[in-house]
């Protein structure tokens, strides 16, 4: 059995039927797929089409109980997902290092900053310092937003100053870049990367 750091058991997501084509105007809150699944499909599209190489980092696991029924075989009986020390995804696009986190919230009024940890913020700052492109993809309020790391840093530091522990809906809509949902790729975040970082030498269509 594999458990999360809070002790809850891990239950893999089961398929619930045939996938349907989703139009670009669909509300994200009405879709069956998770943000992670959509991003994984998007990254596969980028890879197959030679656009970018982006992968999800494996979640570290701590094994606490192993059974050895045979000398040549081992069965993991109990393990826990460890807290990730960095971000969810990384890779390369047009010679630039890409590093980002993906988060979801069901709140209808704000995005809680408790979804992040200090060590993740520090990691993103280090990436930007070295010239990497760092951002957050947030699923909130029925839409998906691309939030540059620099804006996240502002909200994080503000939390320390005045105690506001969330990004309001209006703030996210203003600071973030709304991404229209598509079919292939599903969440075309590279288009935003291109606009923000390669606008003078655009190649991506």
From Swiss-Prot:
Its EC number is 3.1.21.10. Its cofactor is Mg(2+). Residues 1-26 are annotated as: Disordered. It catalyses: Endonucleolytic cleavage at a junction such as a reciprocal single-stranded crossover between two homologous DNA duplexes (Holliday junction). Binds 1 Mg(2+) ion per subunit. It holds the Pfam family RecU. Keywords: Cytoplasm, DNA damage, DNA recombination, DNA repair, Endonuclease, Hydrolase, Magnesium, Metal-binding, Nuclease. Mg(2+) binds at residues 86, 88, 101, 120. Its main location: cytoplasm. It is found in: Cytoplasm. One of its GO terms (molecular function) is endonuclease activity. One of its GO terms (biological process) is DNA repair. The record marks 103 as: Transition state stabilizer. Gene3D superfamilies: 3.40.1350.10. CDD domains: RecU-like. GO terms for cellular component: cytoplasm. Endonuclease that resolves Holliday junction intermediates in genetic recombination. Cleaves mobile four-strand junctions by introducing symmetrical nicks in paired strands. Promotes annealing of linear ssDNA with homologous dsDNA. Required for DNA repair, homologous recombination and chromosome segregation. Belongs to the RecU family. This is Holliday junction resolvase RecU. It comes from Bacillus pumilus (strain SAFR-032).
């Amino acid at each position: 059995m594999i458990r999360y750091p809070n002790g809850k058991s891990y239950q893999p997501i089961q398929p619930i039927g045939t996938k349907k084509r989703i139009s670009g105007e669909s509300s994200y809150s009405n879709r069956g797929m998770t943000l992670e699944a959509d991003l994984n499909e998007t990254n596969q599209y980028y890879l197959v089409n030679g656009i970018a190489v982006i992968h999800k980092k494996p979640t570290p696991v701590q094994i606490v109980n192993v059974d050895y029924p045979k000398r040549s075989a081992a069965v993991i009986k109990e393990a826990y997902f460890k807290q990730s020390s960095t971000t969810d995804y990384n890779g390369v696009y047009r010679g630039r290092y890409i590093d980002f986190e993906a988060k979801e919230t069901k709140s209808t009024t704000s995005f809680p900053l408790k979804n992040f940890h200090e060590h993740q913020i520090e990691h993103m700052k280090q990436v930007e310092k070295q010239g990497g492109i760092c951002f957050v993809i947030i699923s909130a309020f029925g839409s998906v937003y691309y939030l540059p790391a620099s804006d996240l840093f502002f909200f994080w530091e503000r939390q320390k100053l005045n105690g506001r522990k969330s990004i309001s809906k209006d703030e996210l809509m203003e600071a973030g870049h709304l991404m229209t949902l598509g079919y292939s790729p599903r969440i075309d975040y590279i288009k935003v990367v291109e606009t923000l970082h390669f606008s003078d030498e655009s190649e991506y269509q």
